[in-house]
């Protein structure tokens, strides 16, 4: 068996095309375009790349894009003050603060300062709580994008044994909640997990997000399993690889995401979807 590749790039482009059409329809109906504020603190090269991609995607679909590039010496109070301004700005539907932040700024305080109805990253405790209670509104972008990828395969998730490797607040934990909502029997693995190999071998659906190249050997993948690789790791030769040993895993899996071109583009597509959702559900005038 050779796995079918889930083309995240093509699916994300399709979503962006649909969003562009919706923005055009909004303008024709006399409504304003959705607005996204993107805040970057410091000059982390990876963060600069991510932020650049998000801003370009915004402009491509016709959103208003506000950019705030702050020095790494920016104080926590200055950042919170900027968030307050964006919270009050009626042209802004979504606020994104690129993580990680410099060490002197407390991430949880920043995330909680963003109004829940403008939290298009889906990190605010209110939005995570909504997902936990099975009434999601603004959902975490990477898990949301992954669910779109899974749906694209046509695989029925109800009753599947799903395994999430990695328990971060950004991917692993909300991903486990999304899979529960999709009817999976879900196990979350982390650094204290014992018998990881045994758990992977039993899983019908595996999502790996640990940030370690080739962390899951391909031969561990159960024949016919669906594999979602969230990892993006740059090797010394400059090539990008995922957290799963792709070549061997692709011989066992029924569907697999490539790296690059799998999950990455979907995260940005989901961010755009959330921004339009916030505009329509929360901020449009009745």
Swiss-Prot record:
Gene3D superfamilies: Leucine Dehydrogenase, chain A, domain 1, NAD(P)-binding Rossmann-like Domain. NADP(+) binds at residues 166-168, 232. The keyword Membrane does not apply. Keywords: Amino-acid biosynthesis, Histidine biosynthesis, Hydrolase, Methionine biosynthesis, Multifunctional enzyme, NADP, One-carbon metabolism, Oxidoreductase, Purine biosynthesis. GO terms for biological process: L-histidine biosynthetic process; methionine biosynthetic process; purine nucleotide biosynthetic process; tetrahydrofolate interconversion. Its EC number is 1.5.1.5, 3.5.4.9. Pathway: One-carbon metabolism; tetrahydrofolate interconversion. PROSITE patterns: THF_DHG_CYH_2 (PS00767). It holds the Pfam family THF_DHG_CYH_C. It catalyses: (6R)-5,10-methylene-5,6,7,8-tetrahydrofolate + NADP(+) = (6R)-5,10-methenyltetrahydrofolate + NADPH; (6R)-5,10-methenyltetrahydrofolate + H2O = (6R)-10-formyltetrahydrofolate + H(+). InterPro entries: Aminoacid_DH-like_N_sf, NAD(P)-bd_dom_sf, THF_DH/CycHdrlase, THF_DH/CycHdrlase_cat_dom, THF_DH/CycHdrlase_CS, THF_DH/CycHdrlase_NAD-bd_dom. It comes from the Bacteria. One of its GO terms (cellular component) is cytosol. One of its GO terms (molecular function) is methenyltetrahydrofolate cyclohydrolase activity. Catalyzes the oxidation of 5,10-methylenetetrahydrofolate to 5,10-methenyltetrahydrofolate and then the hydrolysis of 5,10-methenyltetrahydrofolate to 10-formyltetrahydrofolate. Belongs to the tetrahydrofolate dehydrogenase/cyclohydrolase family. PANTHER family: C-1-TETRAHYDROFOLATE SYNTHASE, CYTOPLASMIC (PTHR48099:SF5), C-1-TETRAHYDROFOLATE SYNTHASE, CYTOPLASMIC-RELATED (PTHR48099). Homodimer. This is Bifunctional protein FolD. It comes from Shewanella woodyi (strain ATCC 51908 / MS32).
